[in-house]
């Protein structure tokens, strides 16, 4: 990624050789507050959500880990893969690259803060489908990005909320005052230093864990883990 952002008179420059990112997929039309009510209907609520997503960048490859589980820890949806790196957009093949290594059996081992559901440490793993090789991913947490800042669970600037033709606003929070037990702060991304088989890279671990989740003894809607 390259370009710049300006906020309250301070300009931030981004160099493509130093700035890594992930472009999310298009989700099509969604029935969001105040906007177009068409689109796929919402799924019936099953009493909880356990979601982990980790796009990870290394010098010579990328890794992708995405997992939805139900309250008992049963897999609802998963994607795991090791992917090649391209030098430019023009180098993209236009079809799925045959060198992509698809994975299954996504695993996780999480530990949480003592007073909230914020992940403090994590180990992930997945198994290559063709070879059966188990890929272990080690993480070192650097800091936490609040998804509320881009509209998720925000009461006024909700993600995709219709605000008429033009609406501009800004907001600031003192991160030291953030309440990690509040509902609107449960959806976060942790910037991580990551390692796979001696390769060191950078990426994020996104978490959204709501409702009970038996494997980690989580109860209630957003109740912290039991001590």
Task: Annotate the PLM regions.
Residues 1-227:
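Structured soluble/peripheral alpha/beta segments that form catalytic or ligand/cofactor-binding pockets
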């Amino acid at each position: 990624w390259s370009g710049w952002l300006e906020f309250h008179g301070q300009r931030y420059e981004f160099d493509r050789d130093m700035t890594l990112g992930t472009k999310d997929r298009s989700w099509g039309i969604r029935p969001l507050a105040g906007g177009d009510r068409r689109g796929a209907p919402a799924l019936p609520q099953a009493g909880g959500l356990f979601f982990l997503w980790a796009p990870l960048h290394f010098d010579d490859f990328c890794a992708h880990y995405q997992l939805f589980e139900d309250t008992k820890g049963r897999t609802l949806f998963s994607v795991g893969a090791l992917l090649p790196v391209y030098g430019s957009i023009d180098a993209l093949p236009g079809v799925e690259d045959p060198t992509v290594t698809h994975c299954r059996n996504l695993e996780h081992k999480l530990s949480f803060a003592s007073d909230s559901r914020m992940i403090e440490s994590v180990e992930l793993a997945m198994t290559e489908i063709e070879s059966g090789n188990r890929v272990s991913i080690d993480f070192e947490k650097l800091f936490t990005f609040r998804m509320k800042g881009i509209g998720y669970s925000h009461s006024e600037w909700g993600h995709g909320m219709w605000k008429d033709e033009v609406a501009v606003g800004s907001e600031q929070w003192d991160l030291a005052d953030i309440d990690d037990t509040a509902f609107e702060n449960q959806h976060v991304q942790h910037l991580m230093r990551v390692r796979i088989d001696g390769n060191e890279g950078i990426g994020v671990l996104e978490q959204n864990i709501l409702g009970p989740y038996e494997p980690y003894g989580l109860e209630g809607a957003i109740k912290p883990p039991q001590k």
